[in-house]
A protein has these predicted regions:
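Short, solvent-exposed loop/turn positions at domain surfaces
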Residues: 9, 31-32, 70-71, 139, ...
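Non-catalytic DNA-recognition/assembly elements of restriction-modification systems
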Residues: 2-29, 152, 156, 164, ...
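Low-complexity, Lys/Gly-biased intrinsically disordered segments
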Residues: 16-53, 70-72, 90, 244-251
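Short amphipathic coiled-coil heptad-repeat segments
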Residues: 1, 8, 173-221
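Short, basic/aromatic beta-hairpin or loop at an interaction surface
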Residues: 49-63, 97-98
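Glutamine-centric residue-chemistry signal
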Residues: 105, 142, 163-164
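A short beta-sheet element
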Residues: 46-47, 65-125, 146
Length: 251
């Protein structure tokens, strides 16, 4: 851990600490001037279009092609880059996983990566980075993580081969967690069905063993209501011995 005296925590000896800006091509944000609007052209994303951690082009506005062409290269997202929201709902990381031209507002940062970005993606989503955002965000109405702050974030970087192993392990466990999460609805349905089945068995006299020594239910009804007259059970041929049918008001 060469030139950083005060690092946030210990890492293996083969790892290194570095600033984000030392690990990527560039860290920029969107145009600070309001872009011109257009009915057609290049999609222009705002924070609400990336708020769920994915690119969403369903309700995007557009800017003219000419405007997009004037944007500098380091502000044009490419497949493999990462978006990082810096204002308001800061700290949302969005992988650029499509080969499509688009641009974005100044409340979103663009991290142009040097190599595969999977490890960096997971690192930027970590509570460690969220803590740095919370610590250094400024402003009152809308907190902002400034670009210089973002560029200066200290990152724990493992050897590349270990990065790949870490990513595989993370994604394995995340898949399991998502499977459990996805099964919640199925589990709730199963629970409801089980409860319904238990009640169904109960009211059909199939939940507990029948004891021939039990007093018939008709005797219970007679004690509750001496004037009770048993129903004609012709439609209830499946009633068990000792059971009876009675109107609700006599219970």
């Amino acid at each position: 851990m060469p030139h950083y005296q005060n690092v946030p925590f210990e890492v293996p000896s083969s790892w290194v600490w570095c600033k984000l800006e030392d690990y990527v091509k560039s860290v920029t944000d969107g145009d600070h001037q309001a872009p011109p609007k257009s009915d057609i052209g290049i999609p222009f994303l705002v924070i609400s279009d990336v708020a769920k951690g994915k690119l969403n082009f369903l309700n995007t506005r557009f800017v003219p092609q000419e405007y997009y062409e004037k944007i500098s290269f380091d502000r044009k997202p490419e497949k493999g880059d990462l978006l990082f929201t810096v204002t308001g709902s800061y700290g949302i990381v969005v992988p650029v996983n499509i080969d499509c031209k688009f641009c974005f507002q100044r409340h979103i940062g663009l991290i142009k990566t040097l190599n595969t970005s999977e490890y960096l993606l997971h690192l930027l989503k970590s509570s460690y980075i969220k803590g740095q955002c919370d610590e250094f965000a400024t402003g009152t109405a809308q907190k902002t993580v400034g670009l210089e702050t973002l560029r200066s974030f200290l990152l724990p970087i493992p050897p590349f081969a270990e990065q790949q192993r870490i990513v595989i392990e993370i994604e394995k466990w995340f898949s399991l967690i998502e499977l459990i999460e996805g099964g919640k609805d199925d589990l709730q349905t199963t629970i409801k069905q089980a409860k319904s089945k238990i009640l169904d068995l109960a009211i059909h006299g199939k939940l507990v063993p029948q004891d021939p020594n039990d007093e018939p239910a008709i005797e219970l009804l007679k004690r509750i209501n001496p004037d009770f007259t048993p129903c004609d059970n012709g439609h209830y041929t499946q009633l068990l011995n000792g059971w009876t049918v009675a109107p609700m008001q006599v219970l």
